């Protein structure tokens, strides 16, 4: 936990919105993403909310998906990488709170991180998760196709998502066998199946009755998953619970943590709630799977 606290100290002591600088930023698509025919205009970064400390950077109007690359020091790299999908209800991306801060923490444990700026807003589309999941699947293929360049193991690439980003990451993972767009180039010849997924308070996987939506059918080929959710989250923890139970039925080794308090949108910023310990539990899970060696 000491490493995480050192990484987060600056964010907890200043009230300005800052985001770590990536080593590089790469385009996810060579041209317009699938299904896009119009220009959404310039991206918009919203000012922090009044009294918000530490501040959160919120980005919207994203029509050109990118990957921001964060690489750990060479002497600490273990070959594992993770693609991070920030949350924001498919309307904004909580860019630093659920993106760049998370990337820096992963770097501190030797994991390369890629923050996905996926298309949004898509909340009014049906299904709202499709475009973000397309971007996530393409991102997996892109990182895997350039594994040598980034010094990562092509068999140790994960997807991580928060809230709506958790749905994007989860949908991309569950539907790995059916690429959610037509392949267009050599990158798309590379597998889009992540080797693991981390879903933190994932949203929208269950219907009004609390049942898992049928389009998210899990089988034995689904990658292992780690879940962290709070019992008192207004975005029901049943999404995590139902997905975990289906993984259990399919024999896919996974891990579920439901904390009594924590609410929604806690990212990995420290608090008095037990939910803020999820990064350590995630680190232990990754280590147990041999992904931090």
Enumerate the predicted regions with their spans.
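Primarily recognizes the serine-hydrolase "nucleophile elbow" in alpha/beta-hydrolase
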Residues: 134-220
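Short beta-strand/loop motif that positions the catalytic acidic residue
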Residues: 221, 227-229
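Conserved alpha/beta-hydrolase "acid-adjacent" motif
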Residues: 234-241
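Active-site glycine-rich loops that stabilize anionic/oxyanionic intermediates
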Residues: 86-91, 231
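Catalytic nucleophile-loop/oxyanion-hole region of alpha/beta-hydrolase
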Residues: 93-96, 101-102, 116-151, 269-275
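Short beta-strand element of the alpha/beta-hydrolase
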Residues: 78-87
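C-terminal catalytic histidine-bearing segment of alpha/beta-hydrolase fold enzymes
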Residues: 241-293
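N-terminal cap/lid segment of alpha/beta-hydrolase-fold proteins
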Residues: 20-77
């Amino acid at each position: 936990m000491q490493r995480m606290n050192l990484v987060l100290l600056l964010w907890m002591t200043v009230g300005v919105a800052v985001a770590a600088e990536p080593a590089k930023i790469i385009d996810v698509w060579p041209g317009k993403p699938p299904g896009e025919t119009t220009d959404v205009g310039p991206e918009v970064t919203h000012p922090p909310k009044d009294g918000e400390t530490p501040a959160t950077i919120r980005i919207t109007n994203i029509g050109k998906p990118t990957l921001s690359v964060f690489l750990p020091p060479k002497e600490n790299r273990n070959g594992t990488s993770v693609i991070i999908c920030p949350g924001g209800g498919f309307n904004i991306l909580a860019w630093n709170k659920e993106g760049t801060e998370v990337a820096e923490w992963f770097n501190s444990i030797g994991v390369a991180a890629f923050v996905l700026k996926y298309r949004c807003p898509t909340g009014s589309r049906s299904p709202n998760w499709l475009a973000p999941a397309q971007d996530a699947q393409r991102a997996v293929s892109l990182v895997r196709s350039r594994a040598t360049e980034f010094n990562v193991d092509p068999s140790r690439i994960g997807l991580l998502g928060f809230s709506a980003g958790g749905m994007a990451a989860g949908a991309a993972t569950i539907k790995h066998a059916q690429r959610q767009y037509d392949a267009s180039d050599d990158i798309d010849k590379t597998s889009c199946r992540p080797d693991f997924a981390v879903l933190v308070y994932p949203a929208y996987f269950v219907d009004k009755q609390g049942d898992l939506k049928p389009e998210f059918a899990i089988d034995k080929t689904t990658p292992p998953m780690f879940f962290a959710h709070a019992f008192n989250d207004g975005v029901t923890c049943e999404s995590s619970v139902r997905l975990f139970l289906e993984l259990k039925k399919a024999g896919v080794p996974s891990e579920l943590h439901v904390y009594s308090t924590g609410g929604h949108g806690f990212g990995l910023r420290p608090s008095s709630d037990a939910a803020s310990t999820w990064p350590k539990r995630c680190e232990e899970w990754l280590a147990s799977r041999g992904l931090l060696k």
